[in-house]
A protein has these predicted regions:
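A short acidic, Gly/Pro-enriched loop at the edge of an enzyme's catalytic core
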Residues: 7-18
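A short beta-strand submotif of the Rossmann-like class I SAM-dependent methyltransferase core
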Residues: 21-24
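S-adenosyl-L-methionine-dependent methyltransferase catalytic module, highlighting the catalytic core
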Residues: 3, 29-37, 47-158
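Generic C-terminal helix-cap and adjacent flexible tail
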Residues: 161-162
């Protein structure tokens, strides 16, 4: 196991069968370079399993800044503000639309196997309030099969190198 910046993976080209990126992309300095590196290290036929925050989710889960002070927690509706204002309140983390993600993969030798938006498992709520948490999870995950899935917590993409 190695620790490295996502933009400069210390692996040989075409050396990996799978790159698993779970809620990482939004934290890197150069997301386009990080995606390019993921593709570079994949063998042909290798896959990226990518999860990253959806701009359509009604809460900013990474907290926000207000008057120079950081406030931890889920903040409602920040992601729905105009992008310039949203980025001032949450400059430490990126969020993505489907088009934003597609742009990151543009021109790379890949094909898309799965592209959808998902809601979370809400295990932390289930742990504290089991009945409510399970009801909430069931309801929100049922929304994944409706047009309201665009409000999901995260993008889940499976991308294959060709």
């Amino acid at each position: 196991m190695l620790c490295a910046a996502s933009e400069y993976l210390p692996y040989q080209s075409e050396s990996m069968d799978l790159v698993f990126s779970h809620e990482v992309l939004e934290h890197v300095q150069d997301d386009a370079l990080a995606v390019s590196e993921m593709v570079r290290v994949l063998k042909p036929g290798g896959r990226i399993a990518l999860f990253c925050p959806n701009l359509g989710y009604p809460f900013e889960t990474h907290g926000h800044y207000w008057k120079g002070k950081y406030h931890f927690g889920n903040t409602p509706l920040i992601n729905w503000l105009p992008r310039k204002l949203r980025d001032k309140l949450a400059p430490h983390v990126e969020v993505y639309t489907r088009k934003d993600l597609a742009r990151l993969f543009a021109g790379l030798p890949v094909k898309f196997i799965e592209r959808r938006t998902i809601f979370g498992a809400y295990d932390n709520i289930i742990e504290r309030r089991p009945a409510l948490g399970k009801l909430l999870r069931g309801f929100l995950q049922a929304l994944e099969k409706t047009p309201l899935q665009r409000l999901g917590l995260s993008h889940f993409w499976v991308v294959e190198k060709v």
